Amino acid sequence: MNLKEKLAELKEQGLAEIKEAKDLKKINDIRVSLLGKKGPITEVLRGMRDLSAEERPKVGQFANAIRDELTQALADKKDEIEVIKMAKKLEKETIDVTLPGVPVTTGNTHIITQIIDQIEKLFLGMGFQVVDGPEVEEDHYNFEMLNLPQDHPARDMQDTFYITEKILMRTQTSPVQARTMEKHDFSKGPLKMISPGKVYRRDTDDATHSHQFHQVEGLVIDKHITMADLKGTLQLIARTIFGEDREIRMRPSYFPFTEPSAEIDVSCFKCNGKGCSVCKYTGWIEVLGAGMVHPNVLEMAGVDSNVYGGFAFGLGPDRFAMLKYGVDDIREFYLNDVRFLSQFSQKG
């Protein structure tokens, strides 16, 4: 019997064994016994050295074809056994679809994030852009660019977390506005932006103060901007957050980066302006600060204050949440008490 005949006989024997295999162990045993280093096919192939140079490649090609055929047959049989095994397993593990499902506990968006998202949605709909910036900020952008010279009281060490002499944790999100004004090309249109984010102050944590809290500051720069534009924008904020029937009033105030400046009150949403403990019986609740952008701030950003004007405002989502939901202690928002936070879960 020549080598080709031996190989053909081994192939038929191998295919028959593969066909009769019932489990994966048997498949592996056949693979090792047929195709392994000590298997019969390997032994036959060792006899190729006695063949002539003309016969050797023909027999080698024939042997490789048989090896490939057996390898494929082993793989097919393995897949067949695994399918049968899985079918038997599924048959034993029948699921009763009439049983009630297991409830899945889902997370909720934090109430402060909900307020910020609500504000962002409002302003994106008005064509504003939402701009982020660094929390570790330069003194230049946090103070100097906002009309706060070196000797201004707000720059006192007791109010600010200084990292180095010129680097600090931002005390407001206004530096984002200063950076954006520097880069904005006003020949392509006005600047309308809000800058939400975390800010830091050297405050002792108590019911109404925190060393870290949130701000959303807004800025509009264009030609012919007036106080009426500011008032209309603030009215929209108040009605979006606190209810459609809210009114606002503006009281004169002082901020270094705006002139004129105003404190903004909203008519009390608990008593509708009649007077209650929430509004301290005044009918009004202070909610934010605002004003027309100071010419010095425009000029320091490279904007011609004789051509352009604008308004700015700043509000605290933490305070908004406290007022809207009657929370007396700001620390409740940061204690990660799921029982407290789940009260504000969004449905649907």
From Swiss-Prot:
Subcellular location(s) of the protein: Cytoplasm
Recorded superkingdom: Bacteria
Residues annotated as signal peptide: none
Enzyme class: ligase
Cofactor note text: Binds 2 magnesium ions per tetramer.
GO annotation terms (biological process): phenylalanyl-tRNA aminoacylation
Alphabetical list of InterPro entries matching this protein: aa-tRNA-synth_II (IPR006195), aa-tRNA-synth_II/BPL/LPL (IPR045864), Phe-tRNA-synth_IIc_asu (IPR004529), Phe-tRNA_ligase_II_N (IPR004188), Phe_tRNA_ligase_alpha1_bac (IPR022911), Phenylalanyl-tRNA_Synthase (IPR002319), tRNA-bd_arm (IPR010978)
Enzyme Commission number, as recorded: 6.1.1.20
Cofactor: Mg(2+)
GO cellular component, one term: cytoplasm
Catalysed reactions, as listed in the record: tRNA(Phe) + L-phenylalanine + ATP = L-phenylalanyl-tRNA(Phe) + AMP + diphosphate + H(+)
Binding site residues for Mg(2+): E259
Ligase among keywords: yes
Oligomer status and interactors: Tetramer of two alpha and two beta subunits.
Protein name stated in the entry: Phenylalanine--tRNA ligase alpha subunit
Originating species: Ligilactobacillus salivarius (strain UCC118) (Lactobacillus salivarius)
Gene: pheS
